[in-house]
């Protein structure tokens, strides 16, 4: 199936990767394992992994570093809860997540990093972010990237929306 995906130009992403390259870590999947079956990248920072598996920013930073250092594409999720949104803390929440992870890395290759804005309140709740809300936070993220890494990196880093959508939105 990995060969078919390659032929059809379908990208296959893992939902997790271990932060160690070598060693005995039963139940974990290494970058080398994923690359050996033609996996194209990994999703890191998803709200469900943060909540159910207690993945904190320190662990996510280690996973992010090992992935990027090994030329493995990362789709890095950031976002806020409904409570953060309602208290107008969503900008601060997103900035804090970036400050503790992505912004701790010196050499970012925008070809290997995608920032996925994932408003937690818009995942499986029936709520969706409006196009205006998504654009507003995307612009904010782009500005933060520019401040930290400069325009060249900022302009070439993909930012996507990772929350729920409805047909009319």
Which residues make up each language-model segment?
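Active-site loop-to-helix "anion-binding N-cap" substructures in soluble metabolic enzymes
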Residues: 1-116, 120-169
């Amino acid at each position: 199936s990995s060969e078919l995906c390659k032929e059809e130009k379908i990208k296959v992403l893992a939902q997790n990767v271990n932060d160690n390259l070598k060693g005995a870590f039963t139940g974990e999947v290494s970058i080398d394992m994923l690359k050996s079956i033609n996996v194209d990248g990994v999703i890191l920072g998803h709200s469900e992994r943060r909540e159910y598996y207690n993945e904190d920013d320190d662990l996510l930073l280690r996973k992010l570093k090992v992935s990027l250092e090994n030329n493995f594409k990362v789709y890095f999720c950031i976002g806020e809860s409904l409570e953060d949104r309602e208290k107008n803390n969503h900008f601060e929440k997103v900035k804090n997540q970036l400050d503790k992870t992505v912004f701790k890395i010196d050499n970012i290759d925008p070809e290997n990093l995608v920032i996925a804005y994932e408003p937690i309140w818009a995942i499986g709740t029936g709520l969706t972010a409006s196009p205006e809300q998504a654009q507003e936070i995307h612009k904010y993220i782009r500005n933060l990237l520019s401040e930290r890494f400069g325009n060249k990196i900022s302009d070439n880093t993909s930012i996507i929306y990772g929350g729920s959508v409805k047909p009319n939105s």
